[in-house]
Amino acid sequence: MIRISQLKLPITHTKAQLEKKIAKTLKNPGNSFTYEIRKQSLDCRHKNDKIFVYTVDVTIRDEQKLAKKVNNNNIMLTKEKPYEFPSPGETPLLHSPVIVGSGPAGLFCGWYLAKAGYCPIILERGEEAEKRQKTVENFWKNGVLDPESNVQFGEGGAGTFSDGKLNTLVKDPYGRNHEVLKRFVAAGAPEEIIYQQKPHLGTDVLVGIVEKMRHEIEEMGGKFCFRSKVTDLIFENNTLKEIEINNDKRIPAQVCVLAPGHSARDTFEMLQKRGVYMEPKSFAVGLRIEHPQEMINMDLYGEPENELLGAASYKVTHKCANGRGVYSFCMCPGGYVVNASSEPGRLAVNGMSYQARDSRNANSAMIVTVTPEDFPDKGVLGGVEFQRDLEKKAWELGEGKIPVQLFGDFCKNQASEALGEVTPCMKGEYILTNVRSVLPKAVGDSIEEGVRAFGKRVSGFDREDALLSGIESRTSSPVRIVRDQELTANMAGIYPCGEGAGYAGGITSAAMDGIKVAETVCRKYAAIKNN
């Protein structure tokens, strides 16, 4: 196989033009070939000459001879190494492995274990995706919160109500990233996510994908139990024996994959009581910021709209004078700010986009790093307490509604009384107030400095009527459930997994970690179906 990089074409190019470019690069006017796009990125440095840059893998006769003949630094011989799931181990499994949580980590762990014959049981505290969607929409419309099935909990995890970004910075020598993307495509995602620089799915597409993955897992011998919150783990001699569900039913368990999500605070409390080792970790908190999507498009594309490219995105970071980092997070082009609360009397927000990314606003979190030093002497769950305190203040400030403030008023530390040209795109009720009043001083100062700095990079970013809303507190897990080289906790049979356990950040990396844990379980234990 020959890999060609730096193939540059206008954004209006056709498939035939790409194929012609490949043939010309290989100096191959006649021989037939097949190709697969490995990467597509956008170069907008010249607004009037926007281009796509491709990396493609080409299969053609006499590849070695051809590669030497062409003598081009952008051409190299390569050999694709397909992903391989390990063969089963020999230790007998007396009971089906139990997976706690059906977010990306739990779903992918479950899918691969089911395919290998392990008949996993997946316990999910929330509802099936279709029921959960109705519950969440009712919450946004009527303010009735279900603490067990909401934006954070339920089939698909917190990522179901997000932009559905699939890019990751995790190094992947084993091919798990590509495997995750292929699995999404097989479940209904568009094929372009395989090679796009910034692939995304959107909430509307994600719901259908997780439903299909559930059905596939069930067809392969897996079982789902919804409205089934794990309330206790029973150990004997530091070894898992049983799992308690809903403070009532107990099931025997030998293997438990813990993939509870980053908001499973009651689960973290239970683990602490049971002696499972955890450690506090750094995370970030802040606010959402909204701008007109056309403004962001103008800055990147040089035009307010481009049908070929869709809504533009940005990624910005800044090191503040106080030493803290402030940066954009979970940027949602053409998206919505959503009420993402999961606990009564507390309020959190998140960003969400549908696949079309066609709302009038762009939004992103403006978040500031916090470390365990910001909540000293609070113990392992100090970060949880820190989050809860901010969310309680936000709920009280907005009387249960999303608190919103214009950036100009934020800088003056005064309540907003009227909107400017930017009007909110939100799911859930909002109220104008002084959002800054709920933030720690260091966080508020950092956001103000950061937005000012970003205004020098993205024209209009620091406009007075940009909208800030909060609080964005669920960026990542505030704890890490400690695991060893065998991916097990200090209690035998427990496999911490995914974002909630502190080993991922986003849909793709969580799914990859789910596969990684499934591999580990498989290497040790014999499959159920073969017993």
Describe the role of every protein-language-model region.
Residues M1-F52, V56-N531:
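Residues forming the flavin
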